[in-house]
Amino acid sequence: MLEEIVVEGRQRSAAEQVLQERIELPVVADVVSAEQISRVGDSTVSLALRRLPAVTVVDGQYIYIRGLGERYSSTTLNGAQVPSPDLTRNVIPLDLFPAAIVETLKVQKGYSPDKPAAFGGGNVDVRTRSLPDRFVADIEVGTGWNSDSTGNGYTYPGGSDDRWGTDDGTRALPREITGAIDQYAGDITPTGILRALDRAGGFNTLADAEQVNRDIALNLNRNLDLRKQSLDPDINVEAALGNMWQVGEGGDWRVGGLAVVDYGDQWRNRERINRSATSPDVDFDVTERTIRQTTLTGSVAVGLDWAEEHQLQASWLYLRNTEDEASLTVGNNFNFQANTGSQLRNYRIRFEERELDVLQLSGRHKLGGATLDVLDFVPGVRNLEDLVFDWYYTDASADTDIPNEVQFSAVDRLDPDTGEFLSTSIRSSATAADYRFTELQDDVTSYGMKFEMPFETGDFLIVPSGGYDYYEKGRGYLQTQLGLGTTASAALPNLVGTPGQVFTDENITNASNGYVLSLGGIGTESYLAGETIDAAFGNVDVTWKETWRLSAGARWEDFARVSVPIDQYEYDTGVGIIRVPLEDIQNQAFAEDDFYPAAALTWMPGQLWADQFQLRFGWSETTARADLREISDATFIDPLTEARVRGNPNLVSSDLTNLDLRGEWFFGSGDNLTVSLFYKDITNPIETVEAPGSDDNIGLTFINAASADVYGLEVEWLKGLDFMSLGKWSDAFFVSGNVTISDSNLTIGSNALNLTNNERRLTQHAPWVINLQLGFDAPNERHSASLAYNAFDERVFFAGSNGAPDAYEQPFHSLDVVYSYYPIEQMALKLRAQNLLDEQIEIEQGGVTVLEQSVGIVFKFDVSYKF
């Protein structure tokens, strides 16, 4: 067996504590511990994962592994699949998980049959804190601030529960409006109301219907004027309490429990500049945004253990992550220019509450010595010695609520000669005020089991294993869009002012102003979807003389999915009934079943330039499937990008062939070196491409490209600086890091849709990624520090079409420092500074910076105490 690597030092040991698991795994994987995450000061899972080799983060939420996006990866929580609160993707955004709940993060880059077959870049398993083996009571309190957010920021009148990240009903769609939509059969325009009034009998005029329409509009929340206020510093509180008790005289029974709570509240100013690639001096805008992010996490786990052979555990996890945004955008286009005395002005508010609620039950049972003594009366039971049986059950739901997302469109009047601001007016438009109310509910039930039965024969250790997984998911997405405005010339004098000054009761109810409230959208924004996976797998792991190890097996999956657009305000069959024709379901359904094989070979010669050496080779065949909305033959407006997106029911799954070669050197001092080569061949990769849009929205759709491949080199290391012979101080320092150099090639083929480049790199693939860290552990264990650097090369942000070049996100160089002081063993003071280089996000297209967004320098201070 491989020897255990043991070293000392607060920070350096954190990296080495997870090495043993990585050594013993049959496939290529990387593991990061909670201590490592704490060392570099990352607050979420997504930020922590970017420190691993060949891992990058997009939009602060989505993980790209080896150049492949979230479509080609899967995320599990304690080994089980969970739902996603993401509005337009099937994958769970990893910024939802705070680092406070994490025990370890495992990124498996080599496929094994016990993992979902939807595997390309890798599988991320978020493993929550395990039950303690002794009494623990921890508390941590922190504060912080951002260099861009130390002054004033935008806000608006919200609800009384905003500090907890939930709305108290202030933003909810008023019952009076939903009642009116039902009463008038989904058409609340004056003509629709008039038809309903006529059906009810009596003499009614269009003027009567217009008045009813205006009365309905009065129920909208219009007290939304932006205002500036001083921003509070960051607040974060984290606490944990747990214990393990021995029960009974023999002490074989143990009962344990752990509870963790985490609360965070922060304000951030984000300035963003958008420019047209073709006319950046004419078509551009500047957005000042203030975002309040509130997080609330609670988890409880209880467990029972008998003789260290049988474990039962029940855990509950609740996550809430809310972003409350207020923004003001001012800009120009070809129709509104400062030299002609006008510019555009848009006010926007958006409150997005995301929740994840997970209940997990699991068990592990081993026929060890204590169990066999109890079952000795069963004939032949000892022939099953060391049989292990694992099982799990997960019931989870994810919800996203975006109430009262509002945008007011306005026009500023300027002095053409000086550019001096003169006045602002709400635009003369039927949708000058755009209201959206969005709800998403994702429900997942999954369960499974696995067994393994190790036995030895001669020089061979053989471990056959197998199991079953079931996954069922249902999703409902409902969006209501309302437009309020006027195009009446008589109303023009009353459009001058802010939204709160213009959309008053007096102005709306004045018939001469001609205000009209209408249902917006195109009828297919809402949808219902579901999918199921039945899976069975088997594997054999054979080790010969502790020198050669072969692990080979296969997974069978029966996959089915359907996604159907619905019009929740179609009243052909009555109020409250959503009609979905059987033909639509059949046309939108997709099903497939297949086998996915995998094999991994490891050579373990012992010492080869190191105390321990391993050489791994892996091969597998996997798949990547379209997201729920991508297969729906409907057009919808993406709530995040405002793009007009059309699904493609003709999409087929992508087939992947994966090859890995990795050499690992482990030294007795704890130093280690890893060198990996990887190659992936993808048939029918799914890509997002530009499609015909509208004057107000770009168009996007999805196609199967012809082929793609990804290949690269990863190098990872940990090295102490004791070789410098500078006494105890050189022993206190270490360097660690990783570098990934890779490339990819995507061939679109005949589905190019006028794309400028039929061949290019995969979207969001960075040719190089680098992580460097200099660590310090004081000999007296009172001080520790880390200087961490993360950077990536430019990556394709979106593909250009009709001759326009591709757009590239520019390199981002992140430099962070963390210092910890331990005045006593139980107490720690931690100071963190992030993005010390004050980098900003930039996207270039054809030499023009089409997007700039500030990030700011972050400073944080935490105090923790362990009782």
Could you describe each region identified by the protein language model?
Residues 375, 432-440, 449-456, 461-465, ...:
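Conserved C-terminal beta-signal and adjacent last beta-strands/turns
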Residues 546-547, 672, 676-686, 697-798:
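Gram-negative outer-membrane beta-barrel transporters
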Residues 51-53, 80-110, 129, 155:
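Short acidic/polar hinge/loop motifs at secondary-structure boundaries
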Residues 179-327, 355-359, 597-600, 604:
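Transmembrane beta-barrel wall of Gram-negative outer-membrane proteins
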Residues 440, 447-450, 492-495, 499-503, ...:
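Outer membrane beta-barrel strand-and-loop segments of large Gram-negative receptors
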Residues 6-38, 70-76, 80, 85:
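N-terminal periplasmic "start-of-domain" segments of outer-membrane beta-barrel proteins
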Residues 96-140, 866:
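A beta-strand signature from Gram-negative outer-membrane beta-barrel systems
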Residues 374-381, 386-394, 398-410, 464, ...:
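Membrane-embedded beta-barrel scaffold of Gram-negative outer-membrane proteins
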